[in-house]
């Protein structure tokens, strides 16, 4: 497995901008200092004598849309964002750009296009034509046009697990691969892969611990309660499946969640994990870590351990272990804290 490397912006060439129709000039520049993720500034200027109406969803912003032409080494790069069905535009869907007025917006391109592979990239903004419906408007609608192209070298996220997803034709045959959705940036992809490596480490450690019965093991007692052979075997099975999911299954991580919690999954939809705000601020390892979050979420899948959320936090998890060990075996946080093992216990 190759280590994920940051993007190196070694070249930011700006080519000549084509003349834009309807008096609209589109200028694209790279954002300085974006060393891990590719961000661009788009400046639109109405060079005509009349106002121009721009469809808001044709401007880079919070909503996904295939607004850029991205190529790597001369070959088109896949758009990975959402494709949205919309109603016909109404007045509220337009933004007015007066004569002589400019508008600058920023876009994070590597979150919407597959820029994980190393190579020479070019990026160009495209403003498609949308037919005007209804009566003629006082302001002209912007017609099809494009910006200049910016070019840059990208080191990419070089990881065998990411590349594996493109090498397999049959979905059921995919193994040990990682894919991304929800506008994951290259920084986020690298962070996820680092967390996944750490999750693999603590899952392996947990499986090794459970491979030999330890009736007096304090680590087990803290998180799964008093020793019982049947429950011990169940814990061993659960972690064997968690380890297998990390090592051998096609994992998908979605970065689109804006909620304050750590992550969530749909138990009957393996192996997709939705990562939220608290995940990104958590440490890689330790209590309530990124690695532990991955273990927690994978345990929820019905094909893994089918755990529930019966109590959150170490205090509640310890209480479950001491008062109802069977429920502790069904609680995702108990699996997470057993795997994280902080503070360390034997």
Curated annotation (Swiss-Prot):
Domain of life per record: Bacteria
Documented EC number(s): 3.4.24.-
Pfam families xref list: Aspzincin_M35 (PF14521)
Residues that hold Zn(2+) according to the record: 296, 300, 309
Cofactor info, note text: Binds 1 zinc ion per subunit.
InterPro entries cross-referenced by the UniProt entry: Fungal_M35_metalloproteases, Lys_MEP, M35_peptidyl-Lys, MetalloPept_cat_dom_sf
Function: Heat-labile protease.
Protein name, as recorded: Extracellular protease
Organism the protein comes from: Aeromonas hydrophila
Originating gene: eprA1
């Amino acid at each position: 497995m190759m280590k994920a490397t940051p993007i190196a912006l070694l070249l930011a060439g700006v080519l000549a901008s084509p003349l834009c129709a309807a008096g609209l000039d589109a200028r694209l520049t790279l954002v300085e200092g974006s060393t891990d993720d590719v961000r661009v500034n788009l400046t639109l200027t109405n060079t005509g004598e009349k106002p121009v109406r721009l469809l808001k969803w044709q401007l880079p912003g919070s909503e996904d849309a295939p607004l850029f032409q991205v190529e790597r080494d001369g070959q088109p790069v896949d758009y990975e964002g959402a494709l949205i069905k919309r109603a016909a535009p109404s007045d509220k869907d337009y933004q007015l750009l007066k004569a002589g007025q400019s508008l600058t917006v920023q876009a994070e391109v590597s979150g919407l296009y597959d820029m994980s592979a190393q190579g020479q990239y070019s990026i160009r903004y495209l403003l498609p034509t949308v037919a005007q419906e209804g009566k003629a408007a006082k302001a002209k609608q912007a017609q099809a046009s494009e910006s200049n192209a910016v070019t840059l070298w990208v080191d990419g996220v070089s990881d065998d697990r990411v590349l594996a997803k493109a090498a397999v034709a049959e979905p059921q045959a995919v193994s040990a691969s990682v894919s991304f959705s929800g506008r994951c940036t290259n920084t986020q992809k690298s962070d996820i892969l680092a967390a996944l490596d750490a999750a693999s480490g603590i899952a392996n450690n947990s499986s090794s611990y459970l491979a030999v019965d330890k009736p007096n093991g304090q680590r087990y007692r803290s998180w799964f309660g008093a020793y019982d052979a049947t429950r011990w075997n169940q814990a061993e099975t659960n972690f064997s499946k968690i380890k297998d999911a990390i090592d051998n299954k096609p994992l998908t991580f979605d970065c689109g969640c804006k909620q304050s919690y750590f992550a969530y999954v749909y138990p009957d939809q393996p192996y997709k994990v939705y990562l939220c705000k608290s995940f990104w601020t958590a440490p890689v390892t330790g209590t309530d870590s990124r690695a532990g979050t991955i273990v927690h979420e994978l345990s929820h899948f019905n094909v893994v351990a089918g755990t529930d959320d019966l109590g959150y936090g170490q205090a509640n998890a310890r209480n479950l272990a001491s008062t109802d060990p069977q429920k502790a075996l069904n609680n995702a946080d108990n699996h997470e804290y057993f795997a994280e093992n902080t503070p360390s216990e034997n």
